[in-house]
Amino acid sequence: MSGWTLNEIDWRAVVPGAVDADLLAVVKTAALVEANAADYVGYLSNVFAGDGVFLSAIQTWGIEEEQHGAALGRWAELADPGFDFAAALAAFRAGYRITQDVSQSIRGSRTGELVARQVVETGTSSFYSAIRDATDEPVLKVIAGHIAADEFMHYRLFARHFARYQSSQPLPLATRLHVAATRFAEAEDDELGWAWFAANILPKAPGAA
């Protein structure tokens, strides 16, 4: 489990106006994506049905991802009192859902799915490390640091399970590279677009939905 909780954050130390509008918009968007982890838990639970070890791990992963979303969302509400995290999350979920009713990974195999998950976790760890290093807002810096560490831990989690599957269901290097490149290219997909819209556009123009 993650080594921190929301109660440990000094929310009174948030400095509204200490971040520019662009970074604030990015954090709001990230909050929605992180908070939507339950859909991915459902998807991965179906893909890895029967693998009790992985299913247990992914439940914990989902709880930690949702905590990331809750922390970022609460910070965003304090930094921008006009932001309604719950309303934005509801709008995001109304507009975007991943398919959970599957029996096989969209990557073609469980091994391929774990390659893709490693790409995601390394990218998000770097993303939050960059936020931590770029901001002077004290609470966001702490939260981003916690999340960056968690995401690296999640990368290691998926790497361990990848090694287990690679030993019994190996993927050729070329296939692994293709999966990684494909997932990397999806970094600007519909999920981020909808999250940005729900967090930053819709609250200012409710009729745009």
Question: Model segments located where?
Answer:
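Non-heme di-metal
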Residues: 1-209
